[in-house]
Amino acid sequence: MRVVPLEAFRDKIPFSVAIAAVERGFAALGRGEAELPDPMVLELPAQQAEVHVKGAHLAGGRHIALKVATGFYRNRARGLPSGDGMFLLLDADTGVPAVLLEEHGYLTDFRTAAAVAVTLKYLAPKDAREALLVGAGALEIGRAHV
């Protein structure tokens, strides 16, 4: 299994590529060509934390994608980020782990910003030139691109 650190891909994926990929994924899901089960949520009240595990597979795709995202809300007091995450890509034919992406929430935020852009493409008035995202937090990543 290849381990890919965040530094290897941070700021190297053009936002237009992310938007196109998200749009293709939504279209495949709409056509019934994607598996996207409900997330598993592990709540840890004693730690004021939660762990989310999500999975997806596109019909005919080379990989099964699994995402683990954590929220450990006491971490700020420890000088650590409250959220973290990684993606694990499994070979779709064998189930063998192929790639581990140490994304630390970066791809999650990037994908979410791309999803907002796709949503605006189809739902915003055609003459709209600006959009206001209230409470968008880390989604600011796509601010200049939407």
Residue ranges and their predicted role:
Residues 1-108, 115-117, 124-127:
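N-terminal ligand-binding/catalytic initiation module
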Residues 108-109, 140:
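Alpha-helix N-cap/loop-to-helix initiation residues
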Residues 135-137:
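Glycine-rich Rossmann-fold phosphate-binding loop(s) that bind the pyrophosphate
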Residues 141-146:
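Conserved small/polar residues in nucleotide/adenosyl-binding loops
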Residues 130-132:
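Conserved beta-strand elements of the Class I
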